[in-house]
């Protein structure tokens, strides 16, 4: 099967320099969602018709399985499909989709393709409570589709029809090529309508059939930021429903954003306002507090992520305790029962089991052993202004508060660093190391007195 995706429109009502089909739904361009659905149908040829912002669209979705056709002037849907004809295989039917209709399911399209077979024209239609603005499906007394009339060209009787054309069609490619060559633009819009192929099919004795989606929202197009927001909420509602049906506890299903793939084990609980980006896996018994952002990460079984944490390309081990207000940056790997507390940042560091950094610390480019206590205000000074260097902290180390470890440096097993230490060379095992200015008390000192203003 050939699949053609129309993605040439300007999107004037978006009031944006970004091509319409690149506006995101769930963090990804609308067109990317349509391409994913198209690929689920295993097409032999996949063609995207570009126009407005063509270079940006090509760059955004370029792939080995995608060919591009260009529509320099946007002269209607029929004209757009004409541009793809040289890239199509006439021995296969062609399915036409739209880059600004991101929620259509593969199951709905498969049903349409099955209904049409290889010899019939198939149209995806839907009954709308208010069909204003949409092309109407006109049927004869026997219920057969005879034509599609656009809103601006419809009579009053035709405007009363509630069954509308979604624009998605499938038909034999040879017939499509013939019918497109006969299209005229003598209509209110002055455009070449793809929908006019229905009348050509009827005239040629080609049966026209229809299929309907499981839900109206599958066919919603986006022409404004308001419609984009509506589609986003529908999509997020669908994601929330999927999670709930899989046994995840969402404290408010209306306040979660999944911008990628979120998979969960058993007895997972997610509080309000959380955002999941990329591929995220939450293992059994995980609890995510309110307003966390988690991207391309795994959270181990029984771990708790307290509110307002940011976790990016990191792995939290089983029974971990993160936050509140903690940040785990790329390359962070935490072992079992590791505690990363409030206002602690960890970057490109491996922290072994049962270690803790509970307050106000930066652990970057470091290897931390087991049962290590990192005191409040501890900083791994990993950057010399040009290069990054690593800090190694072995098992059972105790680091006092307000300590700086100037990398590259190693703290040996069982060592203790006194509060306020600036460590510039290796701290030996099982010993106390500290560097601290001598404390002085100046008996004759007096606090300055504020001078009156003149």
Curated annotation (Swiss-Prot):
Chemical reaction(s) catalysed: alpha-D-glucosamine 1-phosphate + acetyl-CoA = N-acetyl-alpha-D-glucosamine 1-phosphate + CoA + H(+); N-acetyl-alpha-D-glucosamine 1-phosphate + UTP + H(+) = UDP-N-acetyl-alpha-D-glucosamine + diphosphate
Positions bound to Mg(2+): 100, 223
EC numbers: 2.7.7.23, 2.3.1.157
GO biological process: cell morphogenesis; cell wall organization; lipid A biosynthetic process; peptidoglycan biosynthetic process; regulation of cell shape; UDP-N-acetylglucosamine biosynthetic process
Binding site for UDP-N-acetyl-alpha-D-glucosamine: 6-9, 20, 71, 76-77, 98-100, 135, 150, 165, 223, 329, 347, 362, 373
Region of interest (Pyrophosphorylase), ranges: 1-225
Subcellular location: Cytoplasm
Binding site for acetyl-CoA: 376, 382-383, 401, 419, 436
InterPro entries per the UniProt record, alphabetical: Bifunctional_GlmU, GlmU-like, GlmU_C_LbH, Hexapep, MobA-like_NTP_Trfase, Nucleotide-diphossugar_trans, Trimer_LpxA-like_sf
Pfam families found in the cross-reference section: Hexapep_2, NTP_transf_3
Region N-acetyltransferase, annotated ranges: 247-454
Top-level lineage group: Bacteria
Key words of the record: Acyltransferase, Cell shape, Cell wall biogenesis/degradation, Cytoplasm, Magnesium, Metal-binding, Multifunctional enzyme, Nucleotidyltransferase, Peptidoglycan synthesis, Repeat, Transferase
Pathway participation: Nucleotide-sugar biosynthesis; UDP-N-acetyl-alpha-D-glucosamine biosynthesis; N-acetyl-alpha-D-glucosamine 1-phosphate from alpha-D-glucosamine 6-phosphate (route II): step 2/2; Nucleotide-sugar biosynthesis; UDP-N-acetyl-alpha-D-glucosamine biosynthesis; UDP-N-acetyl-alpha-D-glucosamine from N-acetyl-alpha-D-glucosamine 1-phosphate: step 1/1; Bacterial outer membrane biogenesis; LPS lipid A biosynthesis
Cofactor: Mg(2+)
One GO term describing the cellular component: cytoplasm
Catalytic residues, chain numbering: 359 (proton acceptor)
HAMAP family tied to this protein: GlmU (MF_01631)
Family (UniProt): In the N-terminal section; belongs to the N-acetylglucosamine-1-phosphate uridyltransferase family. In the C-terminal section; belongs to the transferase hexapeptide repeat family.
Cited function: Catalyzes the last two sequential reactions in the de novo biosynthetic pathway for UDP-N-acetylglucosamine (UDP-GlcNAc). The C-terminal domain catalyzes the transfer of acetyl group from acetyl coenzyme A to glucosamine-1-phosphate (GlcN-1-P) to produce N-acetylglucosamine-1-phosphate (GlcNAc-1-P), which is converted into UDP-GlcNAc by the transfer of uridine 5-monophosphate (from uridine 5-triphosphate), a reaction catalyzed by the N-terminal domain.
NCBIfam families per the UniProt record, alphabetical: glmU
Protein name: Bifunctional protein GlmU
Annotated source species: Cupriavidus necator (strain ATCC 17699 / DSM 428 / KCTC 22496 / NCIMB 10442 / H16 / Stanier 337)
Chain's gene name: glmU
């Amino acid at each position: 099967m050939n699949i053609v995706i129309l993605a040439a429109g300007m999107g004037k009502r978006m009031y944006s320099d970004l091509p319409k089909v690149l506006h995101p739904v769930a963090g990804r361009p609308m067109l990317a969602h349509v391409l994913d659905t198209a690929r689920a149908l295993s097409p032999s040829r996949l063609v995207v018709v570009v126009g407005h912002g063509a270079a940006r669209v090509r760059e955004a979705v370029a792939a080995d399985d995608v060919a591009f056709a260009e529509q320099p002037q946007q002269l209607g849907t029929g004209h757009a499909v004409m541009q793809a004809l040289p890239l199509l295989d006439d021995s296969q039917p062609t399915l036409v989709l739209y880059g600004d209709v991101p929620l259509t399911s593969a199951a709905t399209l498969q049903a349409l393709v099955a209904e049409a077979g290889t010899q019939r024209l198939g149209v995806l239609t839907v009954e709308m409570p208010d069909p204003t603005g949409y092309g109407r499906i006109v049927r004869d007394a026997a219920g057969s589709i005879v034509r599609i009339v656009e809103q601006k060209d419809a009579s009053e009787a035709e405007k009363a029809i509630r069954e509308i054309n979604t624009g998605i069609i499938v038909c034999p490619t040879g017939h499509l090529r013939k019918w497109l060559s006969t299209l005229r633009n003598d209509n209110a819009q002055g455009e070449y309508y793809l929908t006019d192929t229905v009348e050509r099919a009827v005239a040629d004795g080609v049966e026209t059939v229809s299929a309907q989606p499981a839900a109206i929202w599958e066919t919603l197009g986006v022409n404004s930021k308001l419609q984009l927001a509506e589609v986003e909420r529908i999509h997020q509602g669908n994601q929330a429903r999927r999670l709930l049906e899989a046994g995840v506890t969402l404290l408010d299903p209306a306040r979660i954003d999944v911008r990628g793939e979120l998979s969960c084990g058993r007895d997972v609980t997610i509080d309000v306002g959380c955002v999941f980006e990329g591929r995220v896996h939450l293992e059994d018994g995980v609890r995510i507090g309110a307003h966390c952002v988690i991207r391309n990460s795994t959270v181990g079984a029984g771990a708790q992520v307290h509110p307002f944490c940011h976790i990016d390309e990191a792995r939290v081990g089983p029974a971990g305790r993160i936050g509140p207000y903690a940040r785990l940056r790329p390359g962070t790997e935490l072992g079992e029962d590791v505690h990363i507390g409030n206002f602690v940042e960890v970057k490109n560091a491996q922290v072994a089991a049962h270690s803790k950094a509970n307050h106000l610390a930066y652990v970057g480019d470091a290897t931390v052993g087991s049962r290590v206590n990192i005191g409040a205000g501890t900083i791994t000074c990993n950057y010399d202004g040009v290069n990054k260097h690593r800090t190694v902290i072995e098992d059972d180390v105790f680091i006092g508060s307000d300590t700086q470890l100037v990398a590259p440096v190693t703290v040996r097993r069982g060592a203790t660093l006194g509060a306020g230490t600036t460590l510039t060379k290796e701290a030996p095992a099982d010993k106390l190391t500290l560097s601290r200015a001598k404390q002085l008390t100046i008996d004759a000192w007096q606090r300055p007195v504020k001078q009156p203003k003149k």
